[in-house]
């Protein structure tokens, strides 16, 4: 297994952290290839649950390299908060590596993120306000500052001067916010540069050398397919390519090295922030409230309630196509226990036209009406099941239905939040 990609198949929060935590110990290296501190994932370290945002989940496994690739953006404040937390739990983070080509999140990026979101009013996107969009905007505008730039004091100051000449007038005149000086930012960031220096590598070179040596790499996706800047529900998306294709550009590893693509999907559906969601249910009553409360559907990064709805096979079909999924991991199957019947969306009706996958035209998706089938639920607590055969017949049929509708085999089934509460069918 030279290289595999793990990717979210819905709108994020599918349980990628748990599945990465589960399988990453079988790899020599885990590499994050996109996103920044907006992507919360929960891992278990020495018996303690930790919420990580910046550092790859593989960090909890001794002997596994954890690489932050060139497609990521790095907030040193968040990163070293996580390093300190992990070290307090007895993990030395010696396996952490950071691409010198990854871009820096700077204080003005966060200010601009929050101000721009506020200016959108009722059309807000639902950003985490962690500076992600403005940082990627600078990257694409070729005015961004990379981690390697911070290692040279004079170069860092020179680039900051140029950046602030552009950003300060926007902060002051457009949004009425305080401006920054070069010295202000250097006072905070240059000490981080020295802490970061031992971890910085030429990540593409490192990753390809590992593959040449016969080592295995897991590319850990952040966010999800439906939040991808190109393939998601634009403009209600993140600012990076978080689908499987981003693993190539965000790491510098060629596509021929990737053997398997594991898509993570909840047994139902959730979404944080604005944007279309055809199978959405009310959180105030009925099944929507049931899923919110039993599934503890609150964002790791923001603490916001997640919007909840029925499983949408059209979204999974779309994710399978866009990512080239070879396998699926279905999480939170246990949450559905207690429902008499379960609805599954198999198609959309858009003004009398039927779609069996996500329409690429945004307006069509906004007006999509889900077409459901109903299947029997189950009352049993399945959190103790450790093999597929132990599941109730209705739960097994539900998994088989997902396979039939998506055309992708379900290799992993999660029946609880703990690493052990997992059924491994075909992932070897």
Enumerate the language-model features and the residues they cover.
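Non-transmembrane, aqueous-exposed alpha-helical and coiled segments at domain scale
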Residues: 1-428
